[in-house]
């Protein structure tokens, strides 16, 4: 994912946490905040409580891949995805399905996704 699509600064994360709206399921919490950009920006948070670096990076890769697949279908917003404990035991396809579910609830897609 290109640099323009990333949220890295702590101040950006804090703004989205405070002013954004949150939606959750068992595996993920998603914060969304309307931005003035012409595309979405993504921040990913995976706690050390979820496992070692290999496990955390696998979860982050699966989340990033899901956003790459739906890049054209996502509304221009700042989005933060926080992984919860059950996500560590899921396969990439299960992560994709669960993430799509919570993103539909958050109304981040600009059209219907199967």
Swiss-Prot record:
- GO molecular function, a single term: ribonuclease P activity
* GO terms, biological process: tRNA 5'-leader removal
Reaction catalysed? Endonucleolytic cleavage of RNA, removing 5'-extranucleotides from tRNA precursor
Q: Which enzyme class, named as a word?
A: hydrolase
Q: What is its EC number?
A: 3.1.26.5
Quote a single Gene Ontology cellular component term: ribonuclease P complex
Sorted UniProt keywords = Endonuclease, Hydrolase, Nuclease, RNA-binding, tRNA processing
User: According to the lineage, what is the superkingdom?
Assistant: Bacteria
Q: What does this protein do?
A: RNaseP catalyzes the removal of the 5'-leader sequence from pre-tRNA to produce the mature 5'-terminus. It can also cleave other RNA substrates such as 4.5S RNA. The protein component plays an auxiliary but essential role in vivo by binding to the 5'-leader sequence and broadening the substrate specificity of the ribozyme.
Sequence similarity: Belongs to the RnpA family.
| Subunit and partners | Consists of a catalytic RNA component (M1 or rnpB) and a protein subunit.
* Name used for this protein in its record: Ribonuclease P protein component
């Amino acid at each position: 994912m290109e640099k323009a699509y990333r949220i890295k600064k702590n101040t950006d994360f804090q703004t989205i946490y405070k002013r954004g709206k949150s939606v959750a399921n068992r595996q993920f919490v998603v914060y969304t905040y309307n931005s003035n950009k012409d595309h979405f920006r993504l921040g990913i948070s995976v706690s050390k409580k979820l496992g070692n670096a290999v496990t955390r990076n696998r979860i982050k890769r699966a989340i990033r891949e899901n956003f790459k697949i739906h890049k054209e279908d996502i509304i221009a917003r700042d989005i933060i995805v926080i992984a919860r404990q059950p996500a560590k035991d899921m396969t990439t396809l299960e992560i994709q399905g669960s993430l799509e579910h919570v993103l539909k609830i958050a109304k981040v897609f600009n059209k219907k996704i199967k």
